[in-house]
Amino acid sequence: MTEKRAVILLSGGLDSATVVAMAKAEGYSCYTMSFDYGQRHRAELNAAARVARDLGVVEHKVIGLNLDGIGGSALTDSSIDVPEAPGEGIPVTYVPARNTVFLSLALGWAEVLEARDIFIGVNAVDYSGYPDCRPEFVEAFERMANLATKAGVEGQGFRIQAPLQNMSKAQIVQAGMARGVDYSLTVSCYQADDDGRACGKCDSCRLRADGFKAAGIEDPTRYF
């Protein structure tokens, strides 16, 4: 039987950890990729490594990028404050072209591994309104992937899988718990401290806390 491989974007947060567990449950050999891109919340990289070990991935790769050299986001530019109150429109925590860049590098690794599936934990229900989390973006990237690669042109094809796309945060938490995810290992906060403790005020913290509450599951998040 041919090994079924998948490359999975793993930030170290709740959503991406759930996606790794889902892919593993579907029988994939999981190869996870994280990015050190100059983000404010670098504690998520330690969380990603913990999750990768705990879920038994085949290989965990960390790619260095200099997105802070571009700036334009509260997550990569320390002069822009992370908002602690809900706002309207696309928030300043949006990182320009981030998921496009991340998926492109995951696509390259997938082609080398001869993996046909790339998983990403984007969500368009309980989310911050980022344009690169929408179903239209995922579908467009998949079309591009199959036009721009040797494997795609030769008919092997890639699938961009976003299994959380239409799930609420509560449903995501429940799905992860059912598959053995230890959420105490994860970090979601946009301004977590070096120990991975959360602020409890940013949009990501609010979405996470609301998800656990709605799911009726104790939230293991540590706060500073």
UniProtKB/Swiss-Prot annotation:
Zn(2+) binds at residues 189, 199, 202, 205. It holds the Pfam family QueC. Pathway: Purine metabolism; 7-cyano-7-deazaguanine biosynthesis. Binds 1 zinc ion per subunit. The keyword Lipid biosynthesis does not apply. Its EC number is 6.3.4.20. Its cofactor is Zn(2+). It is an enzyme of class 6 (ligase). Signal peptide: none annotated. Belongs to the QueC family. Catalyzes the ATP-dependent conversion of 7-carboxy-7-deazaguanine (CDG) to 7-cyano-7-deazaguanine (preQ(0)). PANTHER family: 7-CYANO-7-DEAZAGUANINE SYNTHASE. This is 7-cyano-7-deazaguanine synthase. It comes from Pseudomonas putida (strain ATCC 47054 / DSM 6125 / CFBP 8728 / NCIMB 11950 / KT2440).
